[in-house]
Amino acid sequence: MQDSTSAPEITPELSAAAHKINVNKLEKAPYDHTGKHPGNKSFSYLLRLMINVGKSVIFRNFEADKIPPNNGGRISIATHINGLVDPSLMILTQKKRIISLGRHDLITGPIIGWWSRRNGAQPVLRKAEVEAGVADENFARKINDRSMLTIANCLAGGHGAVIMPEGKSHQDSKLHALRTGAARAALASAAIARKRGEPAPVIQPTGLHWERHYWFRTKSYVEYTDPIEI
């Protein structure tokens, strides 16, 4: 079995959209460090409705385990091979209001960005953008720190988060090197929750299974194991 030390460090190829940094929109993206969700609650309900309709169209058969209940926040993590379909199913199969991390252009784009901002999604400027000279390192650190602090406070406030530790969607049959975001969010949110006298969040491993992930109208199954206490 491949362990994390041998997982390949593969820099993602930047898309045309990823090459365009909208500094103004990134700075104005909603965030909150008090524990409140930065998104609009009505849009959260509307997003779930849209995902549910999309699920009925995309999948011929869909099944999901009942997610283990917990009193605090929840960090759902999974491998990432199916783009926006992966986090969508993780959002749909739980009741907690979700805050997510997304590539910067998914937050600033003209259509999906409009939805993302209203649902409180937090932008991330990746190492790939910095190394390619697309993003300034200091600006990237500022945005990423702000986003991670928002995620941590939301989790401490009892909300859920969807994080893909590989940091990108890919088609390889092996795990790519993991980013540290999920672990940092877990530790920070647990510390904040305990200081506030609230239950610490848990890490919820999630299995996303497909009969053929590249087929339209394929079968899908979302698996939930026991959560990991922090």
Predicted regions and their residues:
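Generic N-terminal amphipathic, Lys/Arg-enriched alpha-helix
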Residues: 29-34
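Soluble catalytic domains of membrane acyltransferases
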Residues: 2-8, 35-230
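Intrinsically disordered, low-structural-confidence terminal and linker regions
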Residues: 1-27
